[in-house]
């Protein structure tokens, strides 16, 4: 079965990167729009073909004893929770990532493989970086292809 990858960089404005093994696209928008888009992608992919579905989400760490919302309210946490639910609903592998994991992936690396998608808030770039990290960890992509 082929792989279908969806990476999300959550926030009030979120980034989304989708790759089916050959073609890729990215989009940036409000969190609820991106969550809805992830659901439609997972639903379509599960109906059109037998895909191995993968959902990559950037995790969030809450400070201990924090009773106040993060700078974006609770939107980021709600998005991550909804994406976790959608991954389970559609039988996708959930791959949470610490935000720091994408730090070693440069814009030059993304440009080399054709995954540099400029956006005002850089969320599409961040979601592409998360996808690269996941593919490196799964050994689908090799670091030599990026440098």
Named regions from a protein language model:
Residues 1-147:
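Phosphate- and other anionic-substrate recognition elements at nucleic-acid/protein interfaces
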């Amino acid at each position: 079965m082929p792989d279908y990858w969806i990476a999300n960089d959550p926030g009030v404005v979120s980034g989304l990167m989708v790759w089916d093994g050959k073609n890729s696209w990215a989009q940036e928008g409000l969190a609820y729009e991106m969550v809805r888009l992830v659901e439609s992608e997972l639903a379509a992919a599960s109906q059109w073909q037998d895909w191995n579905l993968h959902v990559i989400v950037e995790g969030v760490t809450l400070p201990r004893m924090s009773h106040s919302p993060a700078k974006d309210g609770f939107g980021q946490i709600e998005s991550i929770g909804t994406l976790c639910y959608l991954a389970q609903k559609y039988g996708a592998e959930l791959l949470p990532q610490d935000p720091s994991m994408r730090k070693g992936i440069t814009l030059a690396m993304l440009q080399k493989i054709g995954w540099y998608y400029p956006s005002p808030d850089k969320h599409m770039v961040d979601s592409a970086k998360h996808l690269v990290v996941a593919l490196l960890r799964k050994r689908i992509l090799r670091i030599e292809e990026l440098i």
